[in-house]
Design a protein with these regions (language model features):
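A short acidic, helix-capping loop that chelates divalent metal ions and anchors anionic groups
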Residues: 72, 130-136
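Conserved N-terminal beta1-alpha1 strand-loop-helix module at the mouth
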Residues: 1-123
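Short, intrinsically disordered, charge-balanced linker/junction segments flanking boundaries
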Residues: 124-125, 135-137
């Protein structure tokens, strides 16, 4: 049987509830990837939050940083996730060789997905499939 894992993405703001539930979710051993997606923070505050999260996350869960490969590399995270308007995948892979994973957003475009894979993306993300307020920030 195919083992099912979860790719968890943080909410845009982290509160006590997030830090309460994160260890409980990690104990299920089903969270294979945790994408830290905090678009409204300064880089300094983002670094602080990543360090705090890294103390909680086990080695089996890969930490992916949204939009900032330089921070992901600096903090020895497993990878980064970039959007279409962010840095070019091939440049990220060339400049930040320590990042094992470089993912990219493809929205709903098969063409972008195929192009991203050719450029070296570790994975492609599609969505959102339903109307959401998440992508507004």
């Amino acid at each position: 049987m195919l083992k099912k894992n979860i790719y968890l993405i943080t909410p845009n703001t982290l509160n006590k509830s997030f830090y309460y539930f994160l260890p409980k979710l990690l104990k299920t051993k089903r969270i294979k990837y945790l994408q830290i997606r905090l678009k409204n923070l300064s880089k300094k505050k983002l670094v602080q939050e990543i360090k705090k999260i890294k103390k909680i996350v086990n080695k089996k869960t890969k930490i992916i940083i949204n939009d900032f490969p330089e921070i992901a590399s600096l903090l020895n995270c497993d990878g980064c996730h970039v959007g279409q308007k962010d840095k070019e995948i091939s440049l990220v892979k060339k400049k930040f060789k320590t990042l094992k994973i470089v993912g990219v957003t493809c929205h709903n475009s098969k063409k972008i997905a195929l192009s991203s894979v050719k450029k070296g993306a570790s994975y492609v993300a599609f969505g959102s499939f339903y109307k959401t307020n998440t992508k507004k920030t």
